[in-house]
Amino acid sequence: MSPQTETKTSVGFKAGVKDYKLTYYTPDYETKPTDILAAFRVTPQPGVPPEEAGAAVAAESSTGTWTTVWTDGLTSLDRYKGRCYHIERVFGEKDQYIAYVAYPLDLFEEGSVTNMFTSIVGNVFGFKALRALRLEDLRIPPAYTKTFQGPPHGIQVERDKLNKYGRPLLGCTIKPKLGLSAKNYGRAVYECLRGGLDFTKDDENVNSQPFMRWRDRFLFCAEAIYKSQAETGEIKGHYLNATAGTCEEMLRRACFAKELGVPIIMHDYLTGGFTANTSLAHFCRENGLLLHIHRAMHAVIDRQKNHGIHFRVLAKALRLSGGDHIHAGTVVGKLEGEREITLGFVDLLRDNFVEKDRSRGIYFTQDWVSLPGVLPVASGGIHVWHMPALTDIFGDDSVLQFGGGTLGHPWGNAPGAVANRVALEACVQARNEGLNLAQDGNSIIRQASKWSPELAAACEVWKEIQFNFKSVDTLDLNEIK
């Protein structure tokens, strides 16, 4: 028995229940550069002080339990415990607080998003003392970031592989998402790629169903890729969804994609799980495959403002786990996404260093220490009239993905792709010439449509389509000030 242990046990064990705040609320604590920092939106039960609620979160997500235990004396709680070091009221919300918690790095397994999430959010969200709890942000310290591979390749390597620079990349999700035979599916892929798109995509729930087994889909899509490349002289790709019921089957599908020589595959990282995703990201790095990530199931976790996990946290977790693309909303389309919040986590995906900025929902300064960046994918209810806004909002390092906005063209799939490519090239040229895309966007599209009948037809079809709904997840009043 060590002298330290002897000293602790000799004091004697006092059983019972004590307030969490006596041990885990430490307002004088100075955070360390190696700490993982978390910002929780806490809604306590009536009668529970915010300090007790914040301390309970720190305790239950680190070393604490509901009662004092004898084995507390066999370790150093001061070394391993989480600490609630600051609490602030959320203005404009009744009984809501932001509780800041610091976790020592030794609590977490190196290179494991699974372990990090199991610790921080694995159990505490069901705690009875809280009416609701939401993880708003995490600060991942460089010491922990360096234990992860991260994205298989990153933005610059992807551009070099594709030999495409100076503009956003264009994609399309094949529709209908379910029901097509593999041959008809491959035909749609070919027509879209031939028309000018860089990528086409499996939808998130396209795996290996009776109407289209995965191997058949992979073969017909590979044929479409090679045929369109030969005709256009451009490198093309299709996001072949390797998501499967087991990790072994997922990697088997990824291996087959590698044998076909295609440039990119896909994974549903939340439904597939972080362990599977990290394994697939390592495989892609080793075998030269790009990895597209779909965030299916994210809104179950992140949409409600007072409970769950904000998508900026899921985005950071994906950058650690690994992916070269990830869906990030559109701001202007059919899916949830306020502009400033979206731009905040888009920067967290792409940039090496992001300053704290509460006006964009960023609670902590994040240093990625050269971990490769991830391309945000704008997808969901977008069409050619949205192109100026999308180009302005997301910039060059992004993928703009039009499903119905390509395949819904009245003349067919290839003309739909042509319309999108013409609209994009017109917006990029106008921006480079100094025009303001936000102000002049509609006139830019109208001018381009005069010499592109495909674009003119698309403009006519979607001229009145809008999705005018307010976002559920918005900035707090104190963040807007």
UniProtKB/Swiss-Prot annotation:
**InterPro entries to which the protein is assigned, alphabetical:** RuBisCO (IPR033966), RuBisCo_large_chain_AS (IPR020878), RuBisCO_lsu_C (IPR000685), RuBisCO_lsu_C_sf (IPR036376), RuBisCO_lsu_fd_N (IPR017443), RuBisCO_lsu_N_sf (IPR036422), RuBisCO_lsuI (IPR020888)
Keyword Oxidoreductase in the entry? The reply is yes
List N6,N6,N6-trimethyllysine occurrences by residue.
Answer: K14
UniProt KW keywords:
Acetylation, Calvin cycle, Carbon dioxide fixation, Disulfide bond, Lyase, Magnesium, Metal-binding, Methylation, Monooxygenase, Oxidoreductase, Photorespiration, Photosynthesis, Plastid
- Active-site positions on this chain: K175, H294
Which EC number(s) are documented for this chain? 4.1.1.39
The note on cofactor binding and number reads: Binds 1 Mg(2+) ion per subunit.
**Which residues are noted in the entry as Mg(2+)-binding?**
K201, D203, E204
Proregion positions: 1-2
Entry GO terms, CC? plastid
Give the location in the cell. Answer: Plastid
UniProt-listed GO biological process terms: photorespiration; reductive pentose-phosphate cycle
Q: Which reaction does it catalyse?
A: 2 (2R)-3-phosphoglycerate + 2 H(+) = D-ribulose 1,5-bisphosphate + CO2 + H2O; D-ribulose 1,5-bisphosphate + O2 = 2-phosphoglycolate + (2R)-3-phosphoglycerate + 2 H(+)
Role played? RuBisCO catalyzes two reactions: the carboxylation of D-ribulose 1,5-bisphosphate, the primary event in carbon dioxide fixation, as well as the oxidative fragmentation of the pentose substrate in the photorespiration process. Both reactions occur simultaneously and in competition at the same active site.
Q: What other comment is given for this protein?
A: The basic functional RuBisCO is composed of a large chain homodimer in a 'head-to-tail' conformation. In form I RuBisCO this homodimer is arranged in a barrel-like tetramer with the small subunits forming a tetrameric 'cap' on each end of the 'barrel'.
**Can you tell me which family this protein belongs to?**
Belongs to the RuBisCO large chain family. Type I subfamily.
Q: Which named protein is this?
A: Ribulose bisphosphate carboxylase large chain
Species of origin: Cuscuta gronovii
